[in-house]
């Protein structure tokens, strides 16, 4: 699942994920709230991997994590959550490390090489 308020980023990242053959189905949501509503109402297909933008209006990535961690465990589906950012702001990296549900923190844009590294790290 891609959670990002930028439709352009979602379009580009979905293309990179498909090029890397990580999955056949990429679910995109334009806000944290929209993603939570989807996760609460849909048990299948569950997301194995969530790319979560940090800076979004309304509900940012950190606020999404607070709500996500309160979901029933079966709705969380043990997804690998990777935080996405456009900056190398050290405080964001430090904050990401404080969340046990966050597996990784990377700077946009996603590339085919990054997708290969993610596949090797989490799915092999």
Predicted regions and their residues:
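Alpha4 helix (beta4-alpha4-beta5 surface) of REC/receiver domains from two-component response regulators
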Residues: 63, 77-79, 87-104, 117
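Receiver (REC) domain active-site loop signature in two-component systems and cognate sites
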Residues: 56
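Short amphipathic alpha-helix used as the core "switch/output" element in two-component signaling
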Residues: 37, 62-75
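A Lys-centered signature of the CheY-like receiver
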Residues: 107-108
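Conserved acidic segment of CheY-like receiver
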Residues: 1-8, 13-17
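Helix N-cap/capping motif at the beta->alpha junctions
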Residues: 28-37, 61
